[in-house]
Amino acid sequence: MNCKIKTVSPLTTYAVRHPVLRQGKPIASCAFPGDEDPTSLHLAAVFNEDVIGVVSVFTNATGVFSDLKQMQLRGMAVLPEAQGSGIGKMLVHAAEIYAKERGTTLLWFNARINAVHFYERLGYQIMGEAFEIEGIGTH
């Protein structure tokens, strides 16, 4: 699929966050702490002017590896009809470049259990035990 990755506003991410990550919940549930922080980045995969995938990067530390400069990948989502086409990989790669350009040595995220294999294929490793986010699912 031939699409462009571009920087967008937090509000633009809701077009994918809502149906993929917050389905059946109020649209306000798509707002994440840090969305409006000037150091946060929101990326969208755009195909024929439609947003089909999104990811956000936040300056946030895990509390583990405190000696490393950390950023958090969050809100990674691709519309079902575009999944499996390489869009997610493109978004993660663009987020990695952004983090690296800012001297980040650890890019981390809380992956949903059904997305773990996707991240492992990109070279990421599981750290820690699975946990439940109420109303969202197992991570």
Where are these regions (language model features)?
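Conserved active-site tyrosine of GNAT-family acetyltransferases
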Residues: 17, 119, 124
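Active-site rim helix/loop that mediates acceptor-substrate recognition in acyltransferases
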Residues: 17-48, 62
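A conserved beta-turn-beta hairpin within the catalytic core of GNAT-like acetyltransferases
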Residues: 60-73, 83, 135-138
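Conserved catalytic-core motifs of GNAT/GCN5-like acyltransferases
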Residues: 108-110, 125-139
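A short beta-loop-alpha structural element at the N-terminal edge
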Residues: 2-14
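Conserved GNAT acetyl-CoA-binding A-motif
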Residues: 92, 99-112
